[in-house]
From Swiss-Prot:
Motif segment (Cell attachment site): 464-466
E.C. number(s) listed in UniProt: 3.4.24.-
Record organism: Crotalus atrox (Western diamondback rattlesnake)
Top-level taxon in the UniProt lineage: Eukaryota
Name the UniProt record assigns to this protein: Zinc metalloproteinase-disintegrin VMP-II
Active-site residue numbers: E334
Cofactor(s) listed in the protein's UniProt record: Zn(2+)
Pro-piece positions: 21-190
Note: The disintegrin belongs to the long disintegrin subfamily.
Residues the record lists as binding Ca(2+): E200, D284, C389, N392
Localization per Swiss-Prot or TrEMBL: Secreted
Amino acid sequence: MIQVLLVTICLAVFPYQGSSIILESGNVNDYEVVYPRKVTALPKGAVQQKYEDAMQYEFKVNGEPVVLHLEKNKELFSEDYSETHYSPDGREITTYPLVEDHCYYHGRIENDADSTASISACNGLKGHFKLQGEMYLIEPLELSDSEAHAVYKYENVEKEDEAPKMCGVTQNWESHEPIKKASQSNLPPEQEELLKRYIELVVVADHRMYTIYDGDKTEISSIIYEIVNILTQIFRPLHIRVALIGLEIWSSGELSKVTLSADDTLEAFGEWRETVLMNRKRHDHAQLLTGMIFSGTIEGRTYKSRMCDPKHSVGIVRDHRTRRHFVANRMAHELGHNLGIDHDRDSCSCGANSCIMSATVSNEPSSQFSDCSLNQYLKHIIHYHYTTCLYNEPSKTDIVSPPVCGNYYTEVGEDCDCGPPANCQNPCCDAATCKVTTGSQCAEGLCCDQCKFMKEGTVCRVARGDWNNDICTGQSAECPNKGYYG
């Protein structure tokens, strides 16, 4: 049984609360200074991990008490995760770092169903959390008192004074039919199963980025970890699991052409991916994170509906140094296009000022896809087989840390995971144990109906094009994916 660590944060506010200060995210006009004080409650004799699997923080925001639940993001790395950089003479150096005890977490605020959190606990607490619809950031203050942290609203960060930033993908709605609003949280179980995809992602930092960060490979890696930690959370409502399978730093020079033209840079990166990266690293999609400032206020570029294509399952995104959430938003946007999702129309909404697939990049980035994006994903993406490379779920043993019941991800030793007991809506799953309820055979899967295995011969995935029907076996809740042509 995973022990939950209880950590209490005591808040103390300096007299200069409300004054301006330069923090990692930029110039902040209003902030609170807090002192996290850790109080552990591990059982006697328990082994103390460097970074616990589950943590709980209690603190106050604007004078109101909140409880922040954090769980280690076990979807961040895969077992065959590797990192590659290059010696000054261009020699490839690949390592397989131990990532079991990493320090990147997802979380939620107790009694706030719409809350989210993405936190790095590597050196203090750094990241963001959404509380009562507002985005807050937290980060350590660089003071002699190392325990001091700043908490502030995203809206209090001074915005860049420049022309509106744009996505490089041209609007191309395939249908002029009215968009039917769709909920991201109330899909029937069989539809949730049909939507599941698994993106094994490689992120490449170009030589310009390497130079900007003074050749600090450790810092660059940490930045990419933070970005992908946010990215995995963004895609969860679409039932897409993003796992970082590789990280590459072009430390000796650019390995594909990087220019002011986003189109030329994208094309060159796609060619490099097809001819070089695909031959030495198994993955589904690659993103180039670059220090180049593209012409025309372009922030990113990708190919529309080309996921799984050897040359075109790629994207490029401009780095913004300390604005991790902004970069994660852009990477999610380009991934969305590569999956086939269009820009949002004016009528689309996600409960925020802007959504992931907005054509214009907001200075206050969203972490949510709109109802239109989900509707298009439901209506189009699941009906085509060009994303077949995303069907192969990484082995549950690939995510190399012990299971935690209640994190929505079914891990080794679990039959199901419908989240915390207060949030679980699956009558076939016992949220307290992550086992099927008494009398149930299953709790999830395309071949599971009302907690029972569907009969042998039942079609669980209808043939499209030249593909055959997939058929239930009667012995399992999983829908076999034969993956062959008829």
